[in-house]
Curated annotation (Swiss-Prot):
Part of the 30S ribosomal subunit. Contacts protein S4. Residues 54-117 form the S5 DRBM domain. Gene3D superfamilies: 3.30.160.20, 3.30.230.10. InterPro entries: Ribosomal_Su5_D2-typ_SF (IPR020568), Ribosomal_uS5 (IPR000851), Ribosomal_uS5_arc (IPR047866), Ribosomal_uS5_C (IPR005324), Ribosomal_uS5_euk/arc (IPR005711), Ribosomal_uS5_N (IPR013810), Ribosomal_uS5_N_CS (IPR018192), Ribsml_uS5_D2-typ_fold_subgr (IPR014721). One of its GO terms (biological process) is translation. The N-terminal domain interacts with the head of the 30S subunit; the C-terminal domain interacts with the body and contacts protein S4. The interaction surface between S4 and S5 is involved in control of translational fidelity. GO terms for cellular component: cytosolic small ribosomal subunit. This is Small ribosomal subunit protein uS5. It comes from Metallosphaera sedula (strain ATCC 51363 / DSM 5348 / JCM 9185 / NBRC 15509 / TH2). Belongs to the universal ribosomal protein uS5 family. With S4 and S12 plays an important role in translational accuracy. Keywords: Ribonucleoprotein, Ribosomal protein, RNA-binding, rRNA-binding. GO terms for molecular function: rRNA binding; structural constituent of ribosome. The lineage of its organism: Archaea, Thermoproteota, Thermoprotei, Sulfolobales, Sulfolobaceae. Pfam families: Ribosomal_S5, Ribosomal_S5_C.
Amino acid sequence: MAEEVPVSNVEEWKPRTKIGQLVKEGKITSIKELYARNMSIAEPEIIDVLLPNMKYEVIDIGMVQKQTDAGELSRYKVLVVMGNYDGYVSIGVGKSKQLRVAIQKAIRDAKMHVIPVRRGCGSWECTCGESHSLPFLVSGKSGSAEVVLRPAPKGTGLVAGGVLKTLLTYAGIKDVWSFSRGETRTTDNFIMAGYRALYNTYKFVTPVDWARRR
């Protein structure tokens, strides 16, 4: 179930980076401007300011063990998906002995890895021109898992399973066909492969991009 992403007190925020300072001073006012300048998200508070209406969902909770001098130490490992249902999405991982703290760390990690997702109407079966799907076929890999996302006509829905469907929903994609190969039973690799596929939507230069550069 989607929940509101906790937002820090921006008034008390003391930026540690130049980018953070520009955001707090109001010299960067949109997330699009940040990516247009090829700047990275160096502090989670940047997302609190530029994308304040994000939602998140815990998609996996596991236990990890670490061998120490005092014996075996067990911690929670939490995986979350975060997005605004309108072209921005992220995933994050957090570990801690306390579940609540692990979730907080995962949310913070997700804020540092928000990416823009290019949407469009790339299916030859659809000519509506709306941003309901992807503009072209993309793929992503993580470990032995590979995810391929193909544009689908309007009304198809998300032909994807499990956590991948959740990721696409938070990104604001409504229609897509998905294919997967390799070891997809591991949630971490499967969701990361999907995340990298969405990241690749901005790795290709479209005719519109060429026209803008002229």
